[in-house]
């Protein structure tokens, strides 16, 4: 059986690390448009995965605090992806 709580904990730790690293990457004046596009794509994939994880946790009847943690993770990745999209937009102007 899949250990959804373990997956959530691992993904949350990764999300926290990304929350620290992504702003630094985007602030780097040497980052290329291709790198930002790749980062955006990866963050979008993580946001999609976090959404699927949340849906699985809901489906299997996990408690509200667990679902809430998954929602926060999903929001974190969506926010990071939005930051990358804004950087990409600024680079194209």
Placement of each model-derived feature along the sequence:
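Amphipathic alpha-helical binding modules
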Residues: 66-93
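Generic detector of low-complexity/intrinsically disordered segments
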Residues: 10, 28, 45, 59, ...
